[in-house]
């Protein structure tokens, strides 16, 4: 709590001049005052503390009054400096008159509307002085911020002097200046309840004030008491008159004087109690902190004397320490003189600076805010930063208002010239110059912005610029990233397009290569098919010529004229010989073609290798089988001939060739089984050869599931145990032989038709048949039954020339693309049945299937031959044929299809015939489709078999 709190001042016009008087005051409790001070300090922490330096005008006064004035003003000045108010008091003429009359002590505040330079100078003086005295943080009280003016009553002044005396007394116990300073600061803190940033130099000044007049101390206190009473009475009278100035409303709620006096008395009493209590607490703390200074009894006695008679103790202690006080006073005076000299130098420099057209720079800066004026801007900044409180002096005589103020030294009473104070603004100028380099922009032509607002606007503008720069940088970064991504995407697209183009080119090349390979395959297959067809055609022509020769011989034996036939045959024999040579040549050519095909198939890669499909080498013996197929067809056509001699010779040739094949197969059978089929053996050996060649050529093992070593196909019949398999094979052979004998027995004219056949030829043909059956051990049982029964039933049918030729052609074309097993079956049928029957069977005994045709042949079964027969077996044969024809005729008479006279229901017969004709047309269409589709199927089969190499 500050000692000056609770007092407010008012201004009144007395005798045409402005005076300061105490205003009525409403008492507040100590706690509320303390809390109010704290709240006010918290609310206004940034306001600068400025002090007012009032001009002192000395008048003629009595010596005693001048001494009283010195003491009063000096004590007040020291207290003001100690509390950092920075107030300098001076007495005027009215103050001197009131002191003479012992009326009241007034403190005049004369504020002149001086230039801002003078205001700034005063601010700087106070700041520099306080800063030199103690470099601690400034303490700003709420009352100083509110009024910056203090008026002390006589009682308050007495309390201050007592406190100073107590501080001097405690100082006597110490031995050096440092302990004295600490004791003063501790006492002052305990009394005023303020923080430790109290001005110690102010205490020294108080000590100097009191020590200068030790003898007049008591008289001064008495005078103070009397003047305080008279001042209270005078203020009570003056408060009844309310002037009509601008400060007339201050303290309006505190007009009641009686309440104010009571509250003041109570406040003084509480303050005394508080001072005594704080003093006791201070002594107790000193006792515990430094017990060697005093004894306990001395402390108790010292406290009692302090409470009873403080003034007497103060006088005694001041005599003891007058030497120390004088030394401190001398140091203080030297320091103060030094400060005054510095202020004088600063003032001279400031005059030079401010004389350079201040107003011109100010208005130039006002109207052109884009230019920076260092001097004027620093002045503006200092003026705006250090504003004076808005207290105006309302005086009719403006000439009396002083433009300059002076610093009063209380001890010496010397006055300082007004020019000395202007030097203090120099450091402020230096500080402000650092902040004057920014370009300030004003709102309008007539309004000057506050520097804080200008800095705020600059800071916002800088932040906005930085934000815009950051946004621009982000946008540029995004654009750059987007551009890089676009370039990367375009690059990837170009690479993808190049890759796709390369893939398309590769696919196109592969497609062209595949087409070329396919064309080559088709050409080779077409060439092979043509060769085979030509070979078959030549064999057929050769068989036809041989048949004609046999017929000529038969006719010649019967006595017919055969010159015409021989003539035609003579032309054809050359062709026959040529065709025979062509047959041998075609065989060699077919061998060469097959070799070429094999090499081509081995050289070309199979698509199945790429797909990883496991395939067996099933097409190894295709071309050799095709060659054997040609031979089998030739054999079939030759054995179908009616001449027993030629057929026997050809059969002998083919049988010897097949026996050679059997020998080679028997050599290979030592590795496998003896009774396997010939084709399986051939295929097996060719596969083994291919495997060995492949392994020699490619020693490295291929990858998984690609071109695996082929496995031989083992039928289910070969998976039996060896003993059981052998028994099954024997049963199969036995059954085949029994079926063959049954077929022979069922032919009634078989045994009687042995004319001119040597037993060797028949035996050889029979051996050939048995060898064929031995090669076909794993055939089904039902096939030979059906085939032989069918051939047995239809064998005696009469031949029709056109139908015979057509059926032979269709059979030849149909049997071309089939597998080797089908040809072996046909060889079995033709070789088994017809070789035995061909010894004595005539031309009418050929098997001709029944086919409905548009051609009608009226064949008389009883019509005689062109010449009489010369051999008895022939007559027997004709008799047997006649019996068969009679039986057939009797069947035809009974059959309604063959004998239309037997049919009674004609409509039903017509419907049946119509359905049969439709069925025949459908079958013919199906036959044509099969003929047209079998040739491509054969080519596809050849291609599939060839692709596995």
UniProtKB/Swiss-Prot annotation:
Phosphothreonine found at: 115, 121
Chief localisation class: cytoplasm
Coiled-coil region list: 474-558
Region (Disordered): 691-714, 789-809
Short name of any one Pfam family annotated for the protein: CCDC66
Keywords, alphabetical: Cell cycle, Cell division, Cell projection, Cilium, Cilium biogenesis/degradation, Coiled coil, Cytoplasm, Cytoskeleton, Disulfide bond, Microtubule, Phosphoprotein
Region named Mediates localization to cilia, centrosomes and spindle microtubules and the interaction with PCM1, CEP290, CEP104 and CSPP1: 570-949
Domain of life: Eukaryota
Protein's cellular compartments: Cytoplasm, Cytoskeleton, Microtubule organizing center, Centrosome; Cytoplasm, Cytoskeleton, Microtubule organizing center, Centrosome, Centriolar satellite; Cell projection, Cilium; Cytoplasm, Cytoskeleton, Cilium basal body
GO cellular component term, pick one: cilium
GO biological process terms, semicolon-separated: cell division; ciliary transition zone assembly; cilium assembly; establishment of mitotic spindle orientation; microtubule bundle formation; microtubule cytoskeleton organization involved in mitosis; microtubule nucleation; mitotic metaphase chromosome alignment
Sites bearing Phosphoserine, chain numbering: 369, 606
GO molecular-function terms, A-Z: microtubule binding; protein homodimerization activity
Function: Microtubule-binding protein required for ciliogenesis. May function in ciliogenesis by mediating the transport of proteins like BBS4 to the cilium, but also through the organization of the centriolar satellites. Required for the assembly of signaling-competent cilia with proper structure and length. Mediates this function in part by regulating transition zone assembly and basal body recruitment of the IFT-B complex. Cooperates with the ciliopathy proteins CSPP1 and CEP104 during cilium length regulation. Plays two important roles during cell division.
Subunit structure: Homodimer; disulfide-linked. Interacts with CEP290. Interacts with PCM1. Interacts with ARMC9, TOGARAM1, CSPP1 and CEP104. Interacts with CDK5RAP2, CEP152, CEP192, TBG1 and PRC1.
Protein name: Coiled-coil domain-containing protein 66
Native source species: Pongo abelii (Sumatran orangutan)
Name of encoding gene: CCDC66
């Amino acid at each position: 709590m500050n000692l000056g709190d609770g007092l407010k001042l008012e201004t009144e016009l007395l005798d045409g001049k402005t005076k300061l008087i105490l205003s009525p005051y409403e008492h507040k409790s100590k706690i509320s005052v303390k809390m109010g001070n704290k709240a006010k300090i918290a609310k206004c922490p940034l306001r600068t503390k400025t002090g007012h330096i009032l001009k002192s005008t000395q008048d003629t006064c009595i010596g005693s009054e001048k001494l009283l004035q010195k003491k009063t003003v000096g004590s007040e000045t020291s207290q003001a400096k100690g509390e950092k108010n920075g107030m300098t008091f001076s007495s005027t003429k009215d103050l001197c008159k009131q002191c003479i009359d012992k009326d009241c002590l007034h403190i005049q505040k004369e504020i002149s509307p001086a230039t801002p330079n003078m205001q700034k100078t005063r601010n700087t003086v106070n700041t520099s002085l306080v800063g030199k005295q103690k470099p601690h943080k400034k303490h700003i009280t709420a009352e100083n911020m509110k009024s910056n003016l203090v008026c002390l009553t006589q009682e308050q002044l007495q309390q201050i002097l007592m406190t100073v005396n107590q501080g001097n007394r405690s100082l006597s116990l110490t031995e050096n200046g440092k302990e004295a300073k600490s004791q003063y600061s501790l006492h002052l803190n305990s009394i005023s309840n303020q923080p430790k940033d109290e001005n110690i130099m102010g205490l020294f000044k108080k000590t100097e004030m009191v020590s200068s007049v030790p003898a007049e101390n008591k008289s001064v206190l008495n005078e103070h008491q009397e003047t305080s009473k008279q001042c209270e009475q005078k203020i009570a009278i003056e408060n009844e008159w309310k002037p009509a100035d601008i400060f007339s409303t201050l303290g309006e709620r505190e007009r009641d004087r009686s309440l104010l006096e009571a509250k003041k008395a109570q406040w003084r009493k509480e303050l005394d109690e508080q001072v005594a209590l704080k003093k006791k607490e201070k002594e107790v703390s000193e006792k515990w902190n430094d017990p060697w200074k005093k004894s306990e009894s001395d402390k108790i006695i010292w406290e009692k004397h302090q409470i009873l008679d403080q003034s007497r103790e103060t006088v005694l202690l001041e005599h003891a320490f007058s030497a120390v006080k004088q030394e401190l006073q001398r140091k203080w005076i030297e320091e103060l003189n030094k400060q005054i000299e510095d202020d004088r130098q600063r003032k001279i420099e400031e005059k030079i600076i401010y004389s350079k057209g201040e107003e011109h720079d100010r208005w130039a800066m006002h109207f052109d805010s884009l230019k920076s004026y260092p001097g004027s801007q620093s002045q503006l900044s200092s003026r705006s930063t250090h504003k004076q409180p808005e207290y105006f002096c309302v005086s009719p005589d403006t000439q009396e208002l002083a433009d300059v103020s002076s610093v009063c030294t209380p001890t010496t009473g010397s006055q300082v010239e007004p020019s000395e104070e202007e030097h203090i603004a120099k450091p402020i100028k230096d500080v402000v110059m650092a902040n004057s380099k920014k370009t300030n922009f004003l709102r309008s032509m007539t309004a000057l912005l506050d520097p804080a607002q200008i800095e705020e606007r600059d800071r916002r503008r800088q932040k906005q610029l930085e934000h815009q720069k950051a946004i621009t940088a982000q946008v540029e970064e995004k654009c750059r990233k987007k551009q890089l991504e676009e370039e990367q995407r375009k690059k990837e697209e170009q690479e993808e397009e190049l890759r796709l183009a390369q893939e398309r080119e590769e696919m196109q090349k592969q497609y062209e290569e595949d087409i070329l390979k396919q064309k080559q395959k088709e050409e080779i297959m077409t060439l092979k098919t043509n060769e085979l067809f030509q070979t078959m055609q030549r064999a057929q022509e050769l068989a036809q010529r041989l048949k004609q020769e046999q017929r000529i011989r038969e006719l010649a034996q019967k006595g017919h004229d055969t010159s015409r036939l021989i003539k035609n045959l003579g032309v054809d024999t050359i062709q026959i010989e040529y065709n025979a040579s062509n047959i041998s040549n075609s065989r060699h050519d077919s061998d060469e073609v097959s070799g070429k095909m094999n090499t081509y198939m081995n050289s070309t890669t199979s698509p199945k290798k790429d797909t990883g499909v496991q395939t067996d080498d099933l097409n190894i013996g295709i071309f050799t089988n095709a060659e054997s197929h040609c031979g089998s067809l030739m054999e079939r056509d030759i054995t179908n001939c009616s001449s027993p001699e030629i057929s026997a010779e050809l059969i002998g040739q083919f049988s010897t060739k097949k026996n050679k094949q059997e020998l080679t197969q028997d050599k290979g059978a030592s590795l496998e089984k003896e009774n396997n089929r010939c084709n399986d053996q051939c295929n097996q050996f060719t596969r083994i050869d291919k495997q060995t060649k492949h392994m020699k050529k490619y020693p490295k093992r291929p990858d998984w599931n690609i071109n695996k070593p082929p496995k031989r196909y083992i039928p289910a019949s070969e998976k039996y145990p060896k003993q059981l398999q052998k028994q099954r094979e024997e049963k199969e052979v036995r059954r085949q032989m029994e079926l063959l004998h049954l077929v022979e027995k069922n032919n009634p004219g078989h045994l009687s038709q042995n004319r001119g056949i040597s037993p060797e030829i028949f035996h050889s043909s029979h051996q050939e048949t048995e060898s064929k059956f031995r090669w076909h051990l794993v055939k089904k049982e039902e096939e030979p039954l059906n085939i032989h029964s069918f051939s047995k039933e239809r064998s005696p049918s009469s031949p029709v020339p056109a139908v015979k030729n057509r059926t032979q052609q269709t059979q030849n074309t149909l049997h071309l693309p089939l597998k080797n097993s089908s040809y072996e079956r046909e060889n079995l049928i033709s070789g088994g049945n017809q070789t035995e029957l061909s010894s004595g069977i005539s031309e009418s005994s050929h098997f001709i299937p029944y086919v409905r045709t548009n051609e009608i042949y009226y064949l008389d079964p009883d019509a005689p031959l062109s010449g009489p027969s010369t051999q008895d077996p022939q007559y027997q044969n004709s008799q047997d044929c006649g019996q068969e024809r009679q039986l057939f005729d009797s069947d035809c008479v009974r059959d309604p299809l063959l004998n239309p006279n037997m049919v009674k229901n004609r409509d039903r017969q017509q419907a049946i015939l119509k359905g049969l004709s439709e069925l025949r047309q459908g079958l013919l269409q199906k036959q044509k489709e099969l003929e047209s589709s079998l040739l491509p199927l054969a080519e596809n089969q050849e291609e599939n078999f060839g692709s596995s190499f």
